[in-house]
Amino acid sequence: MKRLLDYLNKYSLDDEILAPQAKGLLGDAKVELGDPGAGIKYYLEAADMADNSFHTPIYLMKAGMLHETEGNYAEALSLYERIQDKYAESNEGRSIDKYIARVKLQID
């Protein structure tokens, strides 16, 4: 896993498809290594790198689910609502209502 992190940290692309995927992989690696905070950071960076209906909702969803796991329900709700508002037609957007309902129950 350490070698993967070293490689991905050196990886630099301007490509709007591969660059977010590399950043998302860094997030995956950090989560696997037990650092969900760093995972969230990388997922949000990946989501913001390419504003499209394929990559962005995937990484917003991953960050939202980690926030939810960490008990940060307001942050999770914000990300889920962003998916609902901007990416409703994505795979994640089509099932986002149940995630929103779940975190709202935790907040109330």
Region spans (language model):
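Short solvent-exposed coil/turn linkers within tandem alpha-helical repeat scaffolds
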Residues: K10-P20, A47-T56, Q84-I96
